[in-house]
Swiss-Prot record:
Organism, as annotated: Escherichia coli O157:H7
Protein name (record): N-methyl-L-tryptophan oxidase
Keyword annotations of the record: FAD, Flavoprotein, Oxidoreductase
Keyword Membrane attributed: no
Pfam families, sorted: DAO
Record has ATP-binding as a keyword: no
Annotated cofactor note: Binds 1 FAD per subunit.
GO CC terms: cytosol
Subunit structure: Monomer.
Length: 372
């Protein structure tokens, strides 16, 4: 059988692409080296932020707004346990923070619902937070967090129900191109399609080592908290920048545990297989201490944690482009630790590509040619 589309990597973007492409009537094969959702990529750990006024640049705002619409649609399939939780997101940092300047600019350009607070205003609204006098907060009322593993599980189930073929726990070992399309090699045999999507996270380096993607081991951890830090008490998700420039992110507490991670830093690795578990690097459990001591002093000890992997591009912007020399193969990689919130819209973009539809978005900033 020759498929319309083969998806290599069925984590966040791949799961979404499988669903949207199958729903569009295409004959699709989803593949993954493991059984998604799983612990081997970048999507585990239960939750991911979704921010609209984007500190990484306003070029992302049209994408994230469409992503939000798609997340809302997906959440309707899990009304008892919604995939999107509108907790709000407070972005904290020095008044001269470049990241916060981008958040404010994005909000102004796209007329987003963002409230600016000074240090006293932040601490009055959320007494659990402590910030210096020179700090400001930009509160995104309509933002919040996503249940990442539930989202992937839902997409995969919906795709399967729609007739999508799924080949999991079966790594793709090679990709070949010829006049008839794309062929993948696996332990289960060879499969052919007219087009392919490669969205395998850091595993992309095993198939396409020439791509400018650097795997980086990252960790996040859960710390002892209480009901004051919960959504029920209106405690928000957050990003926070320390005076030295270190960037952190976190979520409201659930079951008396607050999850937090450090966005910058980490350990450079050469392949996804080199990632060691949480606590095998001495700094893992204490990485968030500088932020917790200064900003959330009421949070207690580290309870447990996990390691994940960023697939960093050189400029930490996404790579969304066809494979050089092969217009029938779309790459979605280099998501650099801020990609999950876009998984829905990136999956839709992939499905449009498979149908020969022109994207509704300007993808020029994400072209591989910027690295030449």
């Amino acid at each position: 059988m020759k498929y319309d589309l083969i998806i290599i990597g069925s984590g966040s973007v791949g799961a979404a692409a499988g669903y949207y492409a199958t729903r569009a009537g295409l004959n699709v094969l989803m593949t993954d080296a493991h059984m998604p959702p799983h612990q081997h990529g970048s999507h585990h750990g239960d939750t991911r932020l979704i921010r609209h006024a984007y500190g990484e640049g306003e070029k992302y705002v049209p994408l994230v707004l469409r992503a939000q619409t798609l997340w809302d649609d997906l959440s309707r399939h899990n009304e008892d346990d919604p995939i999107f939780v509108r907790s709000g997101v407070i972005n904290l940092g020095p008044a001269d923070s470049a990241f916060l300047a981008n958040v404010a600019h994005s909000a102004e350009q796209w007329q987003l619902n963002v409230e600016k607070l000074d240090a006293q205003g932040i601490m009055a609204r959320w007494p659990e937070i402590r910030v210096p006098d020179n700090y400001i907060g930009l509160f995104e009322t309509d933002s919040g967090f996503l249940r990442s593993e539930l989202a992937i599980k839902t997409w995969i189930q919906l795709a399967k129900e729609a007739g999508c073929a799924q080949l999991f726990n079966c790594p793709v070992t090679a990709i070949r191109h010829d006049d008839d399309g794309v062929t993948i090699e696996t332990a289960d045999g060879e499969y052919q399609a007219k087009k392919a999507i490669v969205c395998a996270g850091t595993w992309v380096k095993d198939l396409l080592p020439e791509l400018p993607v650097q795997p980086v081991r990252k960790v996040f951890a859960w710390y002892q908290a209480d009901g004051r830090y919960s959504v029920k008490n209106k405690f928000p998700a957050f990003t926070g920048e320390l005076p030295n420039g270190d960037q952190y992110y976190g979520f409201p507490a659930e079951n008396d545990a607050l999850k937090i991670g450090k966005h910058n830093g980490g350990q450079v690795i050469h392949s996804a297989d080199e990632r060691v578990p949480f606590a095998e690097v001495v700094s893992d459990g204490s990485e968030a201490f500088p932020f917790l001591r200064n900003v959330l002093p009421g949070i207690g000890c580290c309870l447990y944690g996990a390691a994940c992997t960023y697939d960093n591009s050189p400029d930490e912007d996404f790579i969304i482009d066809t494979l050089p020399g092969h217009d029938n193969t779309l790459l979605i990689t280099g998501l650099s630790g801020h990609g999950f919130k876009f998984a829905s819209v990136l999956g839709e973009i992939a499905a449009d590509f498979a149908q020969d539809k022109k994207s509704d978005f300007d993808l020029t900033p994400f072209s591989l040619s910027r690295f030449q």
